[in-house]
């Protein structure tokens, strides 16, 4: 038993040890015990609860508004020690599958992909739900509102999202202040913060390297890992920066900024990765990966959203797939896994690959690890499975690891990349 009950009616408490006055007087009613941890926190039960009740309610709302409200609820829940504890009890995995990467020890290989929390609004919430790392952004140098609304759509039968957000975010200056406030109030987050760097829409392509570099410089002290996003389909001509000249110029400039800041602040340089699109040939993918590695990138994120669409017999999904923008979710799974395997074959085992695209359960994550991913991320999976996805994936990976002949998750990486 956790041994405490807090009720608002008479401010009475039953607990072991001393609680601060503000907790005793709080207007909440929380009962935590072994029954909660042993029953309600089981990932399958919590996942079913979300699918039966949470997801149907969100279905009646505009996709972007539902996203914003869910993020606000997570932020609110993580702002109070009691509700933050409840998040940990309900959603945090109870197993450890450690992975060492970039000088950090990740509790397991599962993290949050960029796009879910663009402006770093719910960092403590993501940590409380058990993710091993969180990627904020895309962050652009300048604040921008993105494309006209509506711009986010759900295809429920295919478990896919289509968006044309257009790098809407608060901009690097405001996000720097938000991260600084977070550190001043709460200290550094207990898990690594990754920062996805995007190009400001008004910045010409031939000045993109300066735009990325300025955002990197502004957020350098607050992020642990940085991802250069040259693959969003929702910023005009952005994917042209994946060619040799554009990618090389951006990487060299950002690496130069990285080295200068590390020297100036007497610190270690920060890992810098690139994120690529799925809409290219195998030969193009291999060329981009080798170009990035040759020019000093510390790894690659595979992959961003796709402009391709699957066939469907469901009218609502067909309407969504008719929308312009990038698609994520289950239909991207096989393509993403194929790309991971392709890159792993091309670059060998010593270059980190972050796998993202269509992860909705432990089997999806396991397949990406086998294909060669060092870590994996999800975005759409959280929309359709809810916050219990982390526990589902991590516990499922643990079960598969025990049933395999591998001693650790690190031993799984790339075992089926041939």
Q: Each PLM stretch: what is its role?
A:
Residues 113-114, 275-277, 353-359, 379-380:
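Glycine-rich beta-strand-to-loop/alpha-helix junction loops that act as flexible
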Residues 1-3, 25-39:
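One-face residue pattern on beta-strands with alternating periodicity enriched for small/polar residues
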Residues 98, 102, 111-295, 309-312, ...:
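Active-site entrance/lid segments in N-terminal catalytic domains of soluble metabolic enzymes
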Residues 4-27:
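Extracellular/periplasm-exposed beta-strand and loop segments of Gram-negative cell-envelope proteins
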Residues 135-144, 230-232, 299-307, 365-392:
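Glycine-rich phosphate-binding active-site loops on the catalytic face of alpha/beta enzymes
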Residues 41-90, 150-153, 157-173, 177, ...:
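Alpha/beta catalytic cores of nucleotide-metabolism and tRNA/nucleoside-modifying enzymes
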Residues 85, 89-108:
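Long amphipathic N-terminal alpha/beta scaffold segment
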Residues 84-93, 233-246, 291-349:
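Glycine/Thr-rich beta-alpha phosphate-binding loop at enzyme active sites
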């Amino acid at each position: 038993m956790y041994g405490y009950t807090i009720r608002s009616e008479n401010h009475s408490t039953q607990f072991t040890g001393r609680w601060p006055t503000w907790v005793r007087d709080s207007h909440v009613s929380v009962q935590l015990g072994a029954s909660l941890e042993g029953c309600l926190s089981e990932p399958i039960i919590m996942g079913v609860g979300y699918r039966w009740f949470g997801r149907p309610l969100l279905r009646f709302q505009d996709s972007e508004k539902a996203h914003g409200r869910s993020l606000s609820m997570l932020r609110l829940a993580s702002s109070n020690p009691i509700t933050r504890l409840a998040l940990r009890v309900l959603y945090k995995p109870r197993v450890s599958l450690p992975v060492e990467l970039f000088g950090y020890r990740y509790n397991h290989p599962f993290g949050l992909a960029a796009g879910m929390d663009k402006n770093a609004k719910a960092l403590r919430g993501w940590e409380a739900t058990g993710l091993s790392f969180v990627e904020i952004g895309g962050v652009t140098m300048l604040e921008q509102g993105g494309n006209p609304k509506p711009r986010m759509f759900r295809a429920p039968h295919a478990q896919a999202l289509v968006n044309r957000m257009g790098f809407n975010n608060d901009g690097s200056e405001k996000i720097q202040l938000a991260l600084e406030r977070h550190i001043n109030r709460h200290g550094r987050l207990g898990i690594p913060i990754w920062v996805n760097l995007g190009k400001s829409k008004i910045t010409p392509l031939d000045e993109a390297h300066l735009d990325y570099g300025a955002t990197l410089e502004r957020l350098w002290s607050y992020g642990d890992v940085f991802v250069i996003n040259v693959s969003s389909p929702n910023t005009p001509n952005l994917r042209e920066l994946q060619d040799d000249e554009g990618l090389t110029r951006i990487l060299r400039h950002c690496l130069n900024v990285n080295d200068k800041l590390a020297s100036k602040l007497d610190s270690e340089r920060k890992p810098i990765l690139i994120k690529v699109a799925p809409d290219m040939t195998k030969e193009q993918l291999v060329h981009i990966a080798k170009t990035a590695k040759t020019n000093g990138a510390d790894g690659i994120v595979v992959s961003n959203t796709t402009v391709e669409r699957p066939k469907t017999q469901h009218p609502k999904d067909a309407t969504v797939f008719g929308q312009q923008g990038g698609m994520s979710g289950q239909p991207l799974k096989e393509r993403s896994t194929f790309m991971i395997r392709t890159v792993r074959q091309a670059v060998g085992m010593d270059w980190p690959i972050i796998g993202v695209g269509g992860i909705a359960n432990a089997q999806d994550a396991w397949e990406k690890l086998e294909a060669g991913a060092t870590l994996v991320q999800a975005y759409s999976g959280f929309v359709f499975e809810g916050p219990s996805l982390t526990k589902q994936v991590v516990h499922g990976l643990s079960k598969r690891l025990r049933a395999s002949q591998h001693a650790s998750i690190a031993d799984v990486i790339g075992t089926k990349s041939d």
